[in-house]
Design a protein with these regions (language model features):
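Conserved, function-critical positions that sit in or immediately flank catalytic
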Residues: 162-580
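Short, surface-exposed terminal/edge motifs of secreted or surface/virion proteins that either
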Residues: 126-129, 133, 293-299
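Extended assembly-interface regions of large multimeric machines
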Residues: 1-125, 131-138, 146-195, 199, ...
């Protein structure tokens, strides 16, 4: 049977992952019983694999076999650094605003909206959503190029002179830009929560602007029609702009009427006030006398003009055009239009978006008997307008959901040696995320950094330096490991520990086959491809395992890379992008 896993499902999973870094565990009685097991204190970025791939320029694709995900990645692990909620963000593909480029206009009918270029980031790190472009088709297709960069951080729709309409969504802070912006992705977040601010630090900051947008969007309600796409402009419509003459009352007044050559030719058209106390209001024309230029507007039972709260004043400006009727399952949307000198619709204004529409359509109404009397006026050729229903909550209410934020980025900065937990004398080829690792005593790990190499303090060294990546073997145990580094001529750090299955003696950890505290640990001789270095483990306590119990956590993500060489004066800024 046909089925669909929606983008909302993907975004839900991504949000659950991000929100898990702030979750709190409770017992059935509502008391916090174990904060050590929380995800925000128990997710680590790890590095690993000192040995080369078969081709270091083309690392192999990781597999999800248990042998690899659960075992090999742990054996290769060198060190790990904790990821906190401040190190995680939703991200979306980066789309820089570029002059003379076409952008897709949002439409509720587009099945694969996140794949379209319908939002941009400007050089001020402002993110805008494209709601309309000049000559937008009903499907939102790119019909013209954007030549005016959107600017501003207000809550209203931004209309630029090239015909585009944009909605400001949010601004990326300098701190977030440094941490989460990459050549291919930018961060996205929703700052408002049910109980108000996510944090109380938004006044005058980029977060305040986004909060204002989210609040304004919420006040418009669900299913508002904030934009109308003009598909075909039609022809032979009557309309004009001008200033009112004498006012009789709220429903009767004199207009310019320069282009209206006969009685009632504009009956059923709308008049819309563009200045004065009635600005933004308007009504439907029911009578027009050409000789006196007097129009009459429909009234209610009390004689008050429908659509006006009072009488306009002489010299107030107006626009007359075809009446726009919106049909659908919502309410209160109000749209007006104007026409050009050729009788085609040249602009559409949304006076009120209404709410609760899930579907809507537009009918353009004008007097269809314009040629009934002399002089003849051609009947209009119908225009096609498409009302665009906004997302749940309104444009800007939830940027993560609206822009397809089903990608999550984690960021970790490996600074120098990280208190000697991270080697600066070797490279690595794996980075990944491990959740819920534990210490040897069974507690969940909480340290900010952990050293996962096995450390051996040596004596009786033969003077030959152990070489990074080479294989060493315990003379008694038969256990093998790979050299991470050799420190101060007396400390060997190893990874990829493989105990011997033939050993009959317990190792340092009480398990047969592991390195023991007093055995000789030697590299192969030079003739067999090794350095020939050799030394003896320095008795009791000289061998210690990594800080984390191997195989105790879940490897959630792994990425194979070409070698990354570390140095004592170097910082690695590691960003992992996960798609849900």
């Amino acid at each position: 049977m046909p089925a669909l896993v929606t983008n909302k499902f993907r975004i839900h999973n991504a949000k659950q992952f991000v929100e898990a870094f702030d979750e709190v565990s409770y017992s059935s009685g509502g008391t916090v019983t174990d904060s050590s097991g929380l995800l925000n204190t128990n997710m680590y970025l790890f590095i690993g694999k000192v040995t080369a791939w078969s081709d270091d320029t083309t690392p192999p694709t990781p597999t999800d076999a248990v042998a690899n995900t659960h075992y090999e990645n742990w054996r290769d692990m060198i060190a790990a650094k904790k990821i906190t909620s401040a190190d995680v963000s939703h991200v979306i593909p980066r789309k820089n605003w570029t002059n003379n480029t076409s952008y897709f206009a949002y439409t509720h009918a587009e099945a694969n909206l996140p794949s379209q270029d319908f939002f941009v980031m400007t050089d001020e790190f402002n993110v805008y959503k494209c709601l309309a472009n000049s000559d937008t088709t009903s499907t939102g297709a790119e019909a013209s190029t954007s030549i005016v960069k959107p600017t501003g951080t207000g809550t209203s729709i931004i209309k630029t002179s090239d015909g585009y309409q944009w909605k400001f969504l949010y601004q990326i802070s300098a701190a977030d830009a440094l941490k989460f912006v990459t050549p291919n992705y930018i961060p996205v977040d929703t700052v408002r929560r049910a109980n108000g601010y996510l944090a109380n630090t938004y006044d005058g900051s980029p977060g305040q602007n986004q909060y204002d947008v989210e609040v304004a969007a919420g006040s418009s309600g669900n299913g508002a029609v904030e934009v109308v796409h003009l598909t075909t402009r039609g022809a032979n419509y009557l309309g004009e702009t001008g200033a009112l003459g004498a006012i009789t009352n709220s429903s009767t007044f004199v207009i310019s009427g320069a282009t209206f050559t006969k009685d009632d030719c504009i009956v059923n058209n709308d008049i819309y006030m563009t200045s004065g106390t009635q600005s933004g209001q308007g009504g439907t024309i029911i009578d027009y006398v050409q000789s006196s230029k007097v129009v009459t507007i429909s009234t209610d039972g009390s004689g008050t003009a429908v659509g006006f709260t009072g009488a306009p004043a002489q010299s107030d400006t107006y626009a007359i055009g075809p009446k726009i009727v919106i049909s659908g399952d919502g309410q209160a949307a109000n749209v007006r239009c104007t026409v050009n000198s050729s009788g085609s619709i040249n602009a559409v204004t949304v006076v009120a978006g209404g709410n609760n529409y899930s579907n809507a359509s537009i009918t353009v109404v004008a007097n269809t008997n314009q040629n009934q009397d002399s002089p003849a006026i051609a009947n209009p050729t119908a225009a096609t307008l498409t009302p665009i229903v906004g997302p749940a909550g309104g444009h800007g209410s939830d940027a993560v959901r609206e822009l397809g934020g089903y990608y999550v980025i984690t960021n970790a900065r490996l600074e120098y040696g990280e208190s000697n937990n991270f080697t600066t004398n070797n490279d690595f080829r794996k980075v990944g995320l491990v959740a819920q690792p534990k210490y040897a005593n069974g507690d969940y790990a909480t340290a900010s950094v952990v050293d996962q190499a096995t450390t051996v303090v040596l004596k009786s060294w033969n003077g030959t330096t152990y070489v990074a990546d080479e294989l060493v073997t315990g003379a008694t145990s038969g256990c093998t490991g790979r050299v991470v580094d050799f420190v101060s001529n007396n400390t060997l750090r190893l990874t990829d520990i493989i105990p011997s299955g033939n050993s009959t003696s317990a190792g340092y950890n009480g398990v047969y086959g592991y390195f023991s505290n007093s055995e000789v640990i030697a590299a192969n001789t030079g003739g067999n491809g090794g350095s020939g270095a050799s030394a003896t483990a320095n008795d009791a306590g000289s061998v210690t395992g990594g800080d984390l119990t191997r195989f105790s956590g879940d490897v959630l993500y792994v990425e194979n890379r070409s070698p990354v060489t570390r140095a004592s004066d170097q910082i690695e800024d590691i960003k992992l992008v996960i798609e849900f």
